[in-house]
C-alpha cells in the first residue's frame, strides 16, 4: 500500500510539472507574432537632493508594427527575435530590435554590474527549479540583462515578474550621464489583446557593489496588440534576407557566453558602436570577419 501511494505521488508530481511546463511554454509562445506596439515611460518620483537634477521627459511613441519571430523553439529553450517595421509605403524603415531567450531551469546568468560589465553567476538548483530565465540582448546580440523567475498562472492570468540590473535603455544612454544602472522590475503578462510589458524601474548611480544612490523611480507601459501577420510582411522579408548573418553573430556570442566568466565590453571601437558595424555596413558577413569584430569589443 505504501509503495502504491509513493508511486502515485511521484506520478502525480511528474504529470503536474509537465502540465505547468506546457502552460509556461504556451504563454511564452503567445508573445510571438505581429503586433501594433506603443512604448510609454514616465519618471514618477524624484528621490535625490541633487541641486541640478533634471528628470527625463515623458517618452511615448506612436504605434509601430513589431514582428516577434521564434528563431528557436524546443521544450526548454525558446528564442524570440523582435524586428520593428516603421513607416508606410512612402517611407519605411526596418530595425532589428531586441531579442529575448527563455531557458527553463537555467543555472548560468550574466548579471549587469555597471559600465558595460556583466558578472557571471552560477545558480544552485533550489534557486532555479521550475523557473524560466529571460535573457535579453541588445540589437547586436551583445548582453543586456537576465533574470530567473517562475511563470504564474492564476485567476485566468499568465505572467512572469523579475527584478534585475541593466544598462541604460537606448532612449536614455545618449542623454543621461548621472546614473549608470537601471534596476528593472519587469512584468510580462499575456492578455486578450496580445501581451503587456510593464516596468517599475529605479535609476541608480552605482559607485561600487556597496555604495549607490537611487535617483528616481520610473514606470513603463508597453502594449503589444496582436494584428494580422501580413502587417509585418516587410519585417519578415528583411529577416529572411538577413537571418543567416545573424545566426553567425548569435553563435559567436554563444561561444563567449559559454566560457562562464565575467564579461566587460568597450562601448566603441575606432569611433563606432558594434551595432553600427553590423547593421549599417556590408563588410561583415562571414564568420571570421564577425568574430574578429566582436573580439575587438571585448576587454581582456
Locate predicted features:
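Sec-dependent N-terminal signal peptides
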Residues: 2-13
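A glycine-anchored, Pro-Gly-centered beta-turn/N-cap motif
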Residues: 31-33
